[in-house]
Amino acid sequence: MSSSTISTITGTQTGTGTSAGTGTGAGPGTGAGAGRPDPAREAADDLCATVLSSLRRKDQREKGRRYVQGLLALPGRKSMRGIAGQIGGGAAEQSMHHFISSSTWEWQPIRASLSRFLEAASPLTAWVAQPMAIPKGGEHSVGVAHRFDPHQGQMFRGQQAFGTWFASAALATPVGWEMFLPEAEEAAAGPAGEHAARAAYEEAAAASVISAVRRGGSPVRPVVLDIRQIGTRSTMNRFAGAGLPVIARIGPSTPLLVTDPALPGHGAGARCARDVLQSVKGLSTPVEWTDPDPSAGGGRHRSTLAVAVRVMMPDPSPARRRPLLLVGEWADPRRAPSELWVTDLVRLPVGPLLRLTKQGRRVAFAAGHSGQEAGLRDFAGRALPGWHRHVTLASVAHAARALTGTEGYGVSYGAA
């Protein structure tokens, strides 16, 4: 990559939130001002030269590069027609449609190459599992169904995808994707109904992260995820079986066994996580962390009370009762804990653990802002391979913005 791009990647991101494009009229918060070069589009050419190298033919690599450039240049929703309009008009639309929906090129090598590129630019801190509900009203897009979103707690019509995000001190960007298909939900529903469907969702969510991490080839790092509505013990066991450390957000009623003999509740059987934390609130300490949301009141530098307690899951199999830490945070010390997490990173102090949980908050914010700008939700085709190809190239476009700090918001997450 060029020296100016490298210095942008390895230095502190500015995230100035100016508008994108070299005269393309992109919307606010996505790059350089009108008439000025867009750093993300400049970086994208270098990025594509590396991560698209698995495409055998030169014309495929060029089409991939042009598609990424179209995503970066086009403001608003990223339709195939709009992308083609940025790179060549009607003839380009037909060519790009075939390249995305009907071609046979593999997307997994590109995702793995993107992970390696990011690791070299800014070493990985954590993997973050981020579900992505995509409301869609039509009948023809792949994966559309009327379904329950356990993370939002409501029904919606659309697609359900699972993203695996690479999070480092300097950037957060997606590198792995799976779509949860209606066929999987229908097969799971059967006589057992909602419980079986929820179990299928949990299994698919965990499997998507484990698969993406294994393919990425990066060093083992913690996985940050939210399992409040999809299962606790089963999810923790899946990641333990895969050899991946995890820190997972849980619900306040999750049953846990206190294993520290010096603390209230030891030997008293399973207690709900909220009660365990309330009994040790007096041991909590202030922890400082950085809020990724620039609109949050009171500035980005925060301090909240937190505590970590040694616990186990009350698993019927004693062999699976592994040592864990329950981490609690109080946004308001006069109230119940605002967030509860369990982790098998039992040697880390509460401060680094709480800051690690904020990677989930950071990615959720990015997914709703820069992820929208990159077109992660905008594929409208009928073919699942087409969705995978689109979301892979949209991830490359998002990475170009993240690497150059032009997502429209900027916050650096230093070492814990």
Locate the predicted segments by residue.
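Active-site-proximal, Lys/Arg-enriched surface segment
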Residues: T104-E183
